[in-house]
């Protein structure tokens, strides 16, 4: 009798906890490893490098963007990292400080294209940053004469 009561409680607790967990997961579309800032707007973007590989990034823009054009920064993380990790955090932080920023997955990594997967090439990484700078230079609100890059770890 006690076993059945305990089992019923465990099943009920599991259902309640599982239900709440699923509701929370559905309520949030934030896919990053860091907290979302209320100071920036984020837009998913795609662009190609000169080899035709499609790169995917998150464009971060200050919510209180002034009328004048802003400086911009392209950001990418170390080998194997994706924009939902450190590069996204750096980009979000700098956007909160008045920059338009682009955190992107390098070729062969994350949502970006390229085969084989999970390889690194200094030449391709250079082209990826060049493509990111080109992409930023034609965005509304970006001062094309004031674009920099942040390469984290091995990409620095």
Where is each model-derived feature located?
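Bacterial N-terminal signal peptides
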Residues: 8-19
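N-terminal cap/lid segment of alpha/beta-hydrolase-fold proteins
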Residues: 28-68
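Short beta-strand element of the alpha/beta-hydrolase
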Residues: 68-78
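The serine-hydrolase catalytic nucleophile loop
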Residues: 80-92, 106
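Glycine-rich "HGGG/HGxG" loop immediately N-terminal to the catalytic nucleophile
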Residues: 85, 108-120
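Conserved alpha/beta-hydrolase
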Residues: 93-113
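Alpha/beta-hydrolase active-site loop
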Residues: 119-140
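Alpha/beta-hydrolase fold nucleophile elbow
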Residues: 141-153
């Amino acid at each position: 009798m006690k076993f059945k009561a305990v089992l019923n409680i465990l099943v009920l607790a599991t259902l309640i906890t599982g239900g709440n967990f699923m509701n929370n997961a559905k309520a949030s579309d934030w896919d990053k490893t860091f907290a979302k800032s209320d100071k920036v707007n984020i837009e998913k973007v795609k662009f190609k490098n000169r080899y035709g590989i499609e790169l995917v990034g998150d464009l971060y823009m200050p919510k209180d963007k002034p009328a004048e054009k802003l400086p911009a920064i392209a950001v990418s993380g170390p080998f194997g990292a994706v924009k939902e990790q450190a590069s996204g955090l750096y980009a979000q932080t700098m956007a909160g400080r008045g920059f338009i920023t682009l955190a992107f997955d390098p070729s062969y990594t994350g949502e970006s294209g390229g085969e084989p997967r999970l390889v690194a090439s200094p030449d391709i990484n250079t082209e990826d940053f060049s493509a990111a700078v080109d992409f930023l230079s034609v965005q509304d609100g970006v001062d094309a004469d004031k674009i920099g890059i942040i390469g984290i770890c091995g990409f620095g």
